[in-house]
Amino acid sequence: MNKKKILKFICSAVLSFTLFSGYKSYAWDGKVDGTGTHALIVTQAVEILKNDVISTSPLSVKENFKILESNLKKLQRGSTYPDYDPKAYALYQDHFWDPDTDNNFTKDSKWYLAYGINETGESQLRKLFALAKDEWKKGNYEQATWLLGQGLHYFGDFHTPYHPSNVTAVDSAGHTKFETYVEGKKDSYKLHTAGANSVKEFYPTTLQNTNLDNWITEYSRGWAKKAKNMYYAHATMSHSWKDWEIAATETMHNVQIGSAGIIYRFLNEVSGTINTTENSKINEIMVVIKTANEDKAGTDHYIHFGIEAKDGKKYEWTLDNPGNDFEKNQEDSYRINLKDNKLTLQDIAKTWIRKERGAGVRDDWKPEYVKVIINSDVKYQANINEWFGDNKTFYINNK
């Protein structure tokens, strides 16, 4: 939606500073061709799993691991893509996550005076895990692996000490310098196993919490806190090269082992070895909408997502991110916070998206698909590929 929001001067100044000074706002280095630190992390995570635990895993997990391994290049490319997504936020706001505040730097940094972004590295991981799981179960293994790689990118981001501390390249030159330091030595940090006792002491812990949504958050929080603590202990610009080497070694080892844990949980989820549970009360809804890749498919009109409960009560939210959403060939994601609501999964009778009647010139819209994620699971989805005129409502109650 081209709402032509004017960001405040400070944001423009910061963006100019970031771009023209050569600083990067993203975390571990990664190349568009699926190489660099991010790709090394996921590659080693797969090797760690193969060396540690796959041989003793259930047959279904072994088979799914073989599929994943055969799509390793997709995993690698996915792991670097978020830094090159042309439609991403200019300052990579959603790559940050402070595990103590649950915010990215747009909520925690005093210098950032523009529009707050409610997506974080942690929420992106949950979203992409759900999307990858959904595609895998459909047999779309390449797409699923690519999406999982993207999720692992965000998981990797909050292992670099600066990201979980919400310290950007604007806050400290150390942000980029530390990442460059690690990139130059990345091969020296390679791991090939999570440890001699990992089969008994680590991997089982990744399956104990059957509530997937809660597990992703708390598993991520544990690792992110380690990285944040490492920032203050060894990784600021005031620390020595010896300190930086301590921080680099610790965080790079952690992210490889942690990523192996994410992949192991994913393989068990899609293999059906976990009796997954979920919260009845809905705390958050994520809505993912792709606008068709056709001429004039985008719209400037408002789009809404709605729910009707079985008691007849209706809820509706405007889907509106900072910047331009619902543009041609663009996928947009929205987080709807329901923590103060008493709505449960069992209450839902209908879900929909609705295009509002706009003032003035007619501006039709053609969505390609919509997916609704609750509890790290795609609950409702639909392939649409229809033109929406004024005030059109589309119901999306199919799984």
From Swiss-Prot:
Gene Ontology biological-process annotations: killing of cells of another organism
Gene label: plc
Enzyme class: hydrolase
Residues that hold Zn(2+) 1 according to the record: 28, 38, 157
Cofactor (UniProt): Ca(2+); Zn(2+)
Positions annotated to bind Zn(2+) 3: 83, 95, 153, 157
Pfam families in alphabetical order: PLAT (PF01477), Zn_dep_PLPC (PF00882)
Sequence positions that bind Ca(2+) 1: 298, 363
Signal peptide (residue range): 1-28
Binding positions for Ca(2+) 3 per the UniProt entry: 299-300, 324-325
Functional summary from the UniProt entry: Bacterial hemolysins are exotoxins that attack blood cell membranes and cause cell rupture. Binds to eukaryotic membranes where it hydrolyzes phosphatidylcholine, sphingomyelin and phosphatidylethanolamine. The diacylglycerol produced can activate both the arachidonic acid pathway, leading to modulation of the inflammatory response cascade and thrombosis, and protein kinase C, leading to activation of eukaryotic phospholipases and further membrane damage.
Organism field: Clostridium haemolyticum
One MF term in the entry's GO annotations: phosphatidylcholine phospholipase C activity
Name recorded for this polypeptide: Phospholipase C
Every Zn-dependent PLC domain range: 29-277
